[in-house]
């Protein structure tokens, strides 16, 4: 595999994982009657869906067709996050902390991918999404701080 395809695969997988994680966190917050926070996380999950669609278009423009399913490593990470979430007692703070950690990881991956040897079209999409991901990360930090 070449570097461009590897980058596309990693980005699309982390976006899929983010969608699943944020959706699950929103569901759990709804169950605890934290509907405003849940709504924010649902909006961020929708953002991930839009980012994934954009990356798919970029991939097709560049002649790539990355797979849609998450990796084993990502599935293990989600499993660990689920265990960690359960150990937190399903508290709103625990759920938001796990979401914040997921956002931190996503931003870190995007920052790394932006420095790779990739076509400028892909780099531009990464940089644009990274700015919004940083904002999303700050939003979740603010939700935690307001608790």
What is each of the regions a protein language model found here?
Residues 38-73, 140-143, 147:
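Conserved alpha-helical segments that form or flank metal/cofactor-binding pockets of metalloenzymes
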């Amino acid at each position: 595999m070449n570097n461009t395809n590897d980058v596309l695969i990693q980005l699309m997988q982390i976006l899929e994982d983010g969608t699943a994680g944020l959706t699950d966190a929103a569901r759990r917050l709804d169950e605890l009657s934290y509907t405003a926070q849940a709504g924010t996380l649902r909006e961020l999950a929708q953002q991930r869906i839009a980012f994934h669609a954009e990356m798919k278009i970029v991939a097709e423009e560049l002649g790539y067709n990355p797979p849609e399913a998450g990796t084993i490593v990502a599935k293990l990470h989600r499993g660990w996050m689920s265990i960690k979430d359960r150990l937190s007692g399903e508290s709103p703070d625990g759920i938001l902390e796990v979401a914040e950690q997921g956002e931190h990881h996503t931003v870190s991956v995007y920052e790394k991918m932006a420095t790779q040897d990739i076509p400028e079209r892909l780099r531009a999409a990464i940089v644009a999404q990274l700015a919004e991901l940083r904002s999303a990360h700050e939003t979740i930090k603010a939700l935690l701080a307001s608790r």
